[in-house]
Amino acid sequence: STVLLFSSILLMLKNNLNNEINESFTSMIIMSALLLKSGAAPFHFWFPNMMEGLTWMNALMLMTWQKIAPLMLISYLNIKYLLLISVILSVIIGAIGGLNQTSLRKLMAFSSINHLGWMLSSLMFSESIWLIYFFFYSFLSFVLTFMFNIFKLFHLNQLFSWFVNSKILKFTLFMNFLSLGGLPPFLGFLPKWLVIQQLTLCNQYFLLTLMMMSTLITLFFYLRICYSAFMMNYFENNWIMKMNMISNNTNMYLIMTFFSIFGLFMISLFYFMF
């Protein structure tokens, strides 16, 4: 925030200093400060550690709401070469950083960095697609963090013993993981599909290939979690939590999961009907 404020003051004083201040350099500093504030690579180092110390609802705010203002300001600056570097680093670090994580909050943090790379890439070439992507990402993140918050889930080993006798709820949780990863035909694939179309129209094939490969890595560790949780039963870990299922919260979660899984079909049906 201090860097952002200082750079803004320099930019305002530019005319009074007989143009001795390089405007592009000042804009680059402002852009770097905004990328730092949004948690994009290579300024992401604070983000996973901050996420680890927050409650799930506060973590959700950090992953979604706190990114709106920086992204809006970045869309006005749009220094493409700096954005391109941040996009490449964000999708790579967001994918690789989540591979060996056992903390769900850090896993969601690196997933957020990866998704932020997709948003920044769409922001480079379109003023509206990144908003659509942000909306769907916020919804899918809310569905997962809502369930994590209800059952106080913070580590992967808790998922292995979670709902041993309730396979349906466990199944819906991992479908939401795959939807967040952008696997078709779930709802999370729709914003990625829009970004892919936009980058294809702009002939950004190298960037698009790199982003899709990073998404495959994120899907790999999501699928690894799903496989481990379904194929193995850790009955000795059942002491981790006593499940007091609040029916209203569970019903709300299942409704949101329905939209997460079948949302793409519903939107496609609505599109072809009207």
UniProtKB/Swiss-Prot annotation:
GO terms for molecular function: NADH dehydrogenase (ubiquinone) activity. This is NADH-ubiquinone oxidoreductase chain 2. It holds the Pfam family NADH_dehy_S2_C. InterPro entries: Complex_I_Subunit_2 (IPR050175), NADH_DH_su2_C (IPR010933), NADH_UbQ_OxRdtase_chain2 (IPR003917), ND/Mrp_TM (IPR001750). One of its GO terms (biological process) is mitochondrial electron transport, NADH to ubiquinone. The chain crosses the membrane at residues 28-48, 54-74, 79-99, 107-127, 128-148, 171-191, 206-226, 254-274. Signal peptide: none annotated. It comes from the Eukaryota. Belongs to the complex I subunit 2 family. Its EC number is 7.1.1.2. Core subunit of the mitochondrial membrane respiratory chain NADH dehydrogenase (Complex I) that is believed to belong to the minimal assembly required for catalysis. Complex I functions in the transfer of electrons from NADH to the respiratory chain. The immediate electron acceptor for the enzyme is believed to be ubiquinone. Keywords: Electron transport, Membrane, Mitochondrion, Mitochondrion inner membrane, NAD, Respiratory chain, Translocase, Transmembrane, Transmembrane helix, Transport, Ubiquinone. It is an enzyme of class 7 (translocase). It is found in: Mitochondrion inner membrane. Coiled coil: none annotated. The keyword Membrane applies. It catalyses: a ubiquinone + NADH + 5 H(+)(in) = a ubiquinol + NAD(+) + 4 H(+)(out). GO terms for cellular component: mitochondrial inner membrane. Its main location: mitochondrion. It is a multi-pass membrane protein. It comes from Drosophila sechellia. The keyword Transmembrane applies.
